[in-house]
């Protein structure tokens, strides 16, 4: 589902090795005075959804590489700012890492004031990978293609609701992009994460959601939702029979979700002491 997973098993191993190598170079702390801090990454903070899956991928590799158990700590909410703030104010000792996605860049333009500085408070450790998103609907929605869904939405303007992971989040922006390109009128219902949004799609409280593939696949496989399209430049190997939105009648549409790894940077005073 991530970049490495779309390739062979050997390529996945290479990608995992690259991530661990980057962690060793950038996440592990420098010499503090006359002492070297030997704290290996053992806490990976995520914000749920696809971030949780990416974090578990990283935690498993960390455990294998360092022989010490690494745990995933999910801190969802407020457009990923809760977990991000925790890491920003964590000790820069190599113990804590943060899985980020598109929201780390989006939030700078969304919030007037953040409790952290996206540029100054973090070291960019590694790119974990990227994944496509999926446009899914409740099975009761009378549409089994994107064209049928667009026709239904235009026939019932404002009557269909879509879920997102919060205002300004990737699911929100991806769906607004879809609305802009197709001219449909959908009502926005923001949720506090992927799972609550998809749960209400299943329950029929909302009819549609565009969400990252890793978090959506269990719902698709269990037939609790119907996948109409993916948002990448090409079809997903995990859903080879599902067309891209560009193929399905929305030319030029492409919207991927990427995942990266950050670590906290020392505050200015600490950086001076470490130099």
Put a short name on every predicted segment.
Residues 130, 216-274:
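C-terminal lobe and pocket-closing loops
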Residues 62, 89-94, 109-196, 245-247, ...:
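Hinge/capping helix and adjacent helix->loop/strand transition within the periplasmic-binding protein
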Residues 4, 21-24, 151:
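Residues marking helix boundaries in flexible regions
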Residues 14-120, 159-161, 182-210, 219:
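N-terminal (or domain-start) structured segment
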Residues 6, 30-46, 263-275:
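Short, compositionally biased segments
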Residues 104-113, 172, 177-181, 208-242:
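A ligand-binding cleft/hinge motif common to bilobed small-molecule-binding domains
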């Amino acid at each position: 589902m991530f970049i490495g997973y779309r390739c062979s098993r050997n390529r996945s191993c290479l990608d995992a090795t690259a991530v661990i190598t980057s962690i060793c170079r950038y996440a592990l702390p420098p010499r503090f005075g006359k002492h070297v801090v030997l704290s290996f990454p053992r806490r990976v903070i995520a914000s749920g959804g696809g971030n949780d899956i990416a974090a578990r991928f990283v935690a498993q590799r960390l455990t294998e590489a360092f022989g010490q158990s690494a745990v995933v700590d999910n801190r969802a909410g407020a457009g990923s700012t809760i977990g991000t703030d925790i890491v920003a104010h964590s000790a820069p000792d190599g113990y804590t890492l943060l899985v980020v996605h598109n929201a780390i860049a989006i939030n700078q333009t969304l919030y007037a004031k953040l409790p952290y500085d996206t540029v100054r408070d973090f070291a960019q450790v590694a790119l974990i990978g990227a994944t496509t998103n999926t446009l899914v609907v409740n099975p009761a929605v009378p549409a089994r293609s994107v064209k049928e869904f667009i026709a239904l939405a235009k026939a019932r303007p404002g009557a269909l609701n879509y879920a997102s992971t919060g205002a300004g989040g990737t699911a929100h922006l991806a769906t607004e992009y879809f609305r802009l390109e197709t001219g449909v009128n959908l009502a926005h219902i923001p949720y506090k994460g992927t799972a609550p949004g998809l749960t209400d799609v299943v329950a029929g409280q909302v009819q549609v959601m565009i969400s990252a593939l890793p978090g959506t696949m269990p719902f698709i496989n269990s037939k609790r939702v119907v996948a109409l399209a993916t948002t990448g430049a090409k079809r997903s190997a995990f859903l080879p029979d599902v067309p891209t939105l560009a193929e399905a009648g929305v030319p030029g549409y492409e919207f991927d979700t990427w995942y990266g790894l950050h670590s906290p940077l020392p505050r200015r005073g600490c950086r001076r002491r470490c130099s």
